[in-house]
C-alpha cells in the first residue's frame, strides 16, 4: 500500500493555497516552509519546495484521489477559481472523475467508484 506521494513545487505559497482551497488537511509545513504534508484519507501528500523545478513534462502520469463527492470537489475547485480539464464524467471503467492541474502542472484526478 502506498502511504504517501511527494510532488515538487517551485512555489510553496501557491501550492499551499491550491491544496488548502480544495480541502486538503495540512499536517505540517505551510506556505513559508520548504516541505508541507497534507492528510489525504489514510495517506499523505507531501509537497517539497524546489525553486529551480522545471515544468512537469507533458507525459508523467497523474495522482488519483478518491473522494466522497466528485461533483462537490469539482464545484469547490471552480469556486476558488481553478479550471478543471473537464466536467465530472462517468467512465466506462466504473468511476466518476475529473482532472485538474496544480500550480506546478501536476495532473490530479478526483474520482469515486460508481457502484
Model-derived segments and spans:
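Short glycine-enriched loop/turn motifs at secondary-structure junctions
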Residues: 1, 55-60, 91-92
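Vicinal oxygen chelate
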Residues: 11-13, 63-107
Amino acid at each position: 500500500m502506498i502511504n504517501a506521494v511527494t510532488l515538487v513545487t517551485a512555489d510553496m505559497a501557491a501550492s499551499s493555497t491550491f491544496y488548502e482551497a480544495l480541502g486538503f488537511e495540512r499536517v505540517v509545513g505551510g506556505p513559508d516552509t520548504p516541505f508541507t504534508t497534507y492528510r489525504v484519507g489514510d495517506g499523505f501528500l507531501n509537497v517539497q519546495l524546489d525553486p529551480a523545478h522545471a515544468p512537469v513534462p507533458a507525459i508523467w502520469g497523474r495522482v488519483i484521489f478518491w473522494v466522497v463527492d466528485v461533483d462537490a470537489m469539482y464545484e469547490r475547485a471552480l469556486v476558488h477559481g481553478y479550471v478543471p480539464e473537464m466536467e465530472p464524467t462517468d467512465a466506462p471503467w466504473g468511476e466518476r472523475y475529473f482532472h485538474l492541474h496544480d500550480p506546478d502542472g501536476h495532473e490530479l484526478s478526483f474520482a469515486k467508484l460508481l457502484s
